[in-house]
Amino acid sequence: MENRERAGAGAVGSAGSLGLRVEQAVFSSASLLFMSVGVEFFSYTAFCFLVTIMGLVIPWSCTLAMIDVYSILVGCPLRVPGVMVIVVIGDWVLAILSLAAASSSAAVIDLLLQFHGSHCSPRFCGRYQLSAMMAFLSWFLTAASSLFNLWFIASR
């Protein structure tokens, strides 16, 4: 048990992976909700990009969380090399896109705040800042998941 868990800590089909996936979905949903509350986000391409990417991360994370739950309940982790490579590539792509979306949104928010609120009311700018922060947290978890799965593939 200890050897199996150590080799698969954070890899698809483990409790660590389930925790990462649930947290990814929660932070991505929070980012999406904070951004979508303000109707004005359509005016900025970076904000639309963030909404689009968070909208992709949520179903990806939820689907892999369901696979993790199934693997934990059945007791047979899904460790097929081809599937693991697809998960790693998907995580890498979403991690890169999440970082790009969070960074560009944070830059636009910083620019809007430098104009002393003339282009963004403090209420909306605060929500946009929270959205970018949640997107960064989602990116961190997606990158960590990708690295755990890559480590598992390399250790085989």
From Swiss-Prot:
This is CASP-like protein 5C1. Signal peptide: none annotated. The chain crosses the membrane at residues 25-45, 47-67, 82-102, 133-153. Residues 1-24, 68-81, 154-156 are cytoplasmic. It is found in: Cell membrane. It comes from the Eukaryota. Homodimer and heterodimers. It is a multi-pass membrane protein. Belongs to the Casparian strip membrane proteins (CASP) family. The lineage of its organism: Eukaryota, Viridiplantae, Streptophyta, Embryophyta, Tracheophyta. Residues 46, 103-132 are extracellular.
